[in-house]
Amino acid sequence: MIQQESMLNVADNSGARSVKCIKVLGGSRRRYACVGDIIVISIKEAIPRGKVKKGEVLKAVVVRTSKGVRRPDGSIIRFDTNACVILNKNTEQPIGTRIFGPVTRELRNEKFMKIISLAPEVL
């Protein structure tokens, strides 16, 4: 569960290392974001010569959460850290060309097939 002020790692090669959630999209009273939800983020730490710079405000999709994802068969998939993939402002496609770490199958339902195809492992 990601909410405002939550810090996340970045799971792509866009140049950002850590980001802060500043808004959960999807309604005025929406409080939490889970895997597959889009959030508005601010870049807090970035590497030199990356595609994004510190202080930029962009959209991102959550790909891993510590809270986990509950499947219809009752199993729960949990991760050690919260992570997101940064999206392009206009097309909502990933900025990076590589995804690091596993992602969940729930992204397929949310129409993020590009992230699924770039990921090294889909759980």
From Swiss-Prot:
GO molecular function: large ribosomal subunit rRNA binding; structural constituent of ribosome
Keyword annotations of the record: Ribonucleoprotein, Ribosomal protein, RNA-binding, rRNA-binding
SMART domains given in the database record: Ribosomal_L14 (SM01374)
Disulphide bridges, residue numbers: none
Function: Binds to 23S rRNA. Forms part of two intersubunit bridges in the 70S ribosome.
Family: Belongs to the universal ribosomal protein uL14 family.
UniProt-recorded name of the protein: Large ribosomal subunit protein uL14
Source organism (scientific name): Hamiltonella defensa subsp. Acyrthosiphon pisum (strain 5AT)
Gene symbol of the encoding locus: rplN
